Amino acid sequence: MKIVVTKSAVKKLEADILAFPFCSGELKKQDAGVLSDFDISAHALKDFKAESGEIVLFYSSSEGHLIARVALLGLGDGKDPDDFRKAAASLAAKAMTMNLQRIAVDCSRFGTIAEDSKKRVGKLAETFVEGCFSGSYKFDRLKSGKLDKKKDDKKVKGISELILRFDASVFADAEEGAAQGEIVGSCQLMARDLVNLPGNYLQAEDIAKAAQDSGSRNGFAVKVLRKKEMEDLAMGGLLAVNQGSTHPPTFSILDYKPEGKAKAVVALVGKGVTFDSGGISLKPSEGMGEMKSDMSGAACVIAAVEAAARLGLSLRVIGLIPATDNMPDGSAQKPGDVITTYSGITVEVGNTDAEGRLILADALTYAKQEYNPDIIIDLATLTGACIVALGYSVAGLFSNNDKLAEEIYAAGISSGEKVWRMPLWDDYDELIKSEVADVNNTGGRGAGSVTAAKFLEKFIDGHKKWAHLDIAGPAFLSKSGGKVTGGTGFGVRLLIDLLKKWA
């Protein structure tokens, strides 16, 4: 999708549809001048409440404009930037259903809205563009018309151009914000594509290739450790999970370095289980197909590092992605096994379906010992218990640093990817004690997301600024889970928001 920011008069805009965004409070003051310009009755406003994402579509007979389709677009009260994202997503989705390729939006009111809500116009432009990317997303690359390159499916189209019209007084800020929104939006869509790929299309090697391709396109280094190197390093957690697989594991290291001095070194660790059957502790068959999404953390990390590079942030951002599938096999690890992780800590495998924490354990220790970063954040679709606690809209936040937790919470609000802090008290250590090893990888029925986080904490080697995000709920939504279905790319916007603040 091409993003065009312009100061041209509305009458000169050319597109398939022209949208006029309104806040709910504006309707009382509105003289219906917009509608009269298009020969549309002012009575049309009576049923338009300007709720976020609300659309009322008209067809103009005016000869003074080049666009016949006119839409009123609701922004809610205009105080929450996320309402702009939702509105834009709704507009893009509407355009997709109508097979429209060029969208124009008159954003002339954004200046007043920004002033009233004490927000930057650039921030509103950024979130609006992000929303358009989200609403235009459609995962159809495995349809026969897409797989067969010889077929020319002219019915399958997408939005090719988004034209945003701003007043000259805010143009520079809007242009910068829209450019950032394009980067964030496109990176999130890349993450969604990876999450939506089924297990027979995405193995550990494919995740490594996705990281390498991103590095090649955007100028950051990518190193991939193979199974032999993992064996030499004694990465017992990742290797144990991989025992039941016919596909070798990978450990991808993405390393973005800014041109000047880095203000900080940030390590992002993403769980990359390409398909999770549960292993010997087999999952129920119902819903197992969604376990292709168990590498959502890995996709998020690739997208965040790419965005950091494209934005030119003055941080060193290191992405670490342990990747494998988790399958039952005659050689698979078994409940009761004891493994030795990269850290030297021994683990009793209480349940082979608690595999994500085993591969993250090796990656977290590697991050601390090899790079000693200022901040470590890991993201993982780690526990169903977190879904029970927080549902599908919010991720669980665990951290050993109050300031870092506050920053992540604020970034969640700002980015529209909300998190809620969960306890990490030492009382929970008792639940993961083992009689035969240093620690057990499961803690029983209660507080499952907390005991998983307490397990991970043992592998950060004393690091003082670490956070764990359990994104099991919002990372993948089934058809009954909301308007967005499949992989959501949750965490990409949140991480980029954080990185931009630290840069």
UniProtKB/Swiss-Prot annotation:
Catalysed reaction equations from the record: Release of an N-terminal amino acid, Xaa-|-Yaa-, in which Xaa is preferably Leu, but may be other amino acids including Pro although not Arg or Lys, and Yaa may be Pro. Amino acid amides and methyl esters are also readily hydrolyzed, but rates on arylamides are exceedingly low; Release of an N-terminal amino acid, preferentially leucine, but not glutamic or aspartic acids
Residues bound to Mn(2+) 2: K271, D276, D294, E355
Cofactor: Mn(2+)
PROSITE patterns according to UniProt: CYTOSOL_AP
GO terms assigned for molecular function: manganese ion binding; metalloaminopeptidase activity
Active site positions: K283, R357
Biological-process GO terms, alphabetical: proteolysis
Cofactor remark from the record: Binds 2 manganese ions per subunit.
The keyword Amino-acid biosynthesis is assigned to this record: no
Residues given in the record as Mn(2+) 1 binding sites: D276, D353, E355
GO CC terms: cytoplasm
Matching HAMAP family: Cytosol_peptidase_M17 (MF_00181)
Similarity comment text for this entry: Belongs to the peptidase M17 family.
Function: Presumably involved in the processing and regular turnover of intracellular proteins. Catalyzes the removal of unsubstituted N-terminal amino acids from various peptides.
Name the UniProt record assigns to this protein: Probable cytosol aminopeptidase
The species this protein was found in: Chlorobium phaeobacteroides (strain DSM 266 / SMG 266 / 2430)
